[in-house]
């Protein structure tokens, strides 16, 4: 269920020692579904699958259409976790604005690693139905170009913003 090295000697591992799942694999999708449903049953209202993408390396083998594989995996995961009803939300962390959420799904796209200069372009390329509600940028800076959409920043960035507000009010 993983991505194989080009030599076919075994599973490919990234530079941080992590193996990547093959999103087209039924076994990988089943394992992810089980993990998501376990979290859902524990009472979590949202699960975000980070790094929902293929690695940027040419050291592994994948001969299929990567975007189609991700799109199909996304649809299967949304359907198998019943994210189209109730209050549970299954979301995806990616840097690919072309991934499309299925109609009626309770889901969001969390854009990872998007430069502030590309925020509007990324949002414009996205095909989600409700961009204000279904796009979330994971930002590491206080750049205001992210603020037209939902944005999550590290606590240190939020503390800096609050300190700047306090300085302005004094």
Where are each of the predicted segments found?
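Active-site-adjacent "subsite" loops/lids of carbohydrate-active enzymes
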Residues: 1-37
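Active-site-proximal loop/short-helix segments
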Residues: 4-7, 45-71
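Extracytoplasmic/secreted proteins, especially bacterial periplasmic and envelope-associated proteins
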Residues: 27-35, 43, 69-76
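Aromatic-lined carbohydrate-recognition surfaces of secreted/lumenal glycan-active proteins
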Residues: 48-50, 68-100, 136-138
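Substrate-binding cleft/loops of secretory-pathway carbohydrate-active enzymes
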Residues: 88-119
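Substrate-binding cleft of secreted/luminal carbohydrate-active enzymes
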Residues: 107-170
């Amino acid at each position: 269920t993983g991505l194989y090295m080009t030599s076919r000697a075994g599973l490919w591992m990234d530079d941080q020692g992590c193996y990547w799942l093959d999103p087209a694999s039924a076994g990988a999708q089943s394992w992810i579904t089980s993990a998501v449903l376990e979290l859902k049953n524990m009472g979590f209202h949202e699960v975000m699958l980070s790094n929902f993408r293929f690695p940027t390396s040419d050291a592994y083998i994948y001969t299929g259409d990567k975007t189609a594989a991700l799109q199909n995996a996304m649809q299967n995961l949304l359907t198998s976790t019943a994210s189209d009803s109730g209050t549970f939300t299954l979301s995806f962390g990616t840097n690919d604005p072309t991934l499309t959420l299925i109609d009626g799904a309770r889901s969001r796209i969390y854009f990872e690693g998007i430069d502030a200069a590309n925020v509007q372009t990324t949002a414009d390329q996205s095909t989600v139905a409700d961009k204000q509600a279904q796009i979330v940028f994971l930002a590491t800076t206080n750049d205001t170009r992210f603020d037209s959409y939902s944005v999550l920043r590290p606590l240190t960035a939020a503390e800096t913003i609050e300190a700047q507000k306090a300085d302005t009010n004094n």
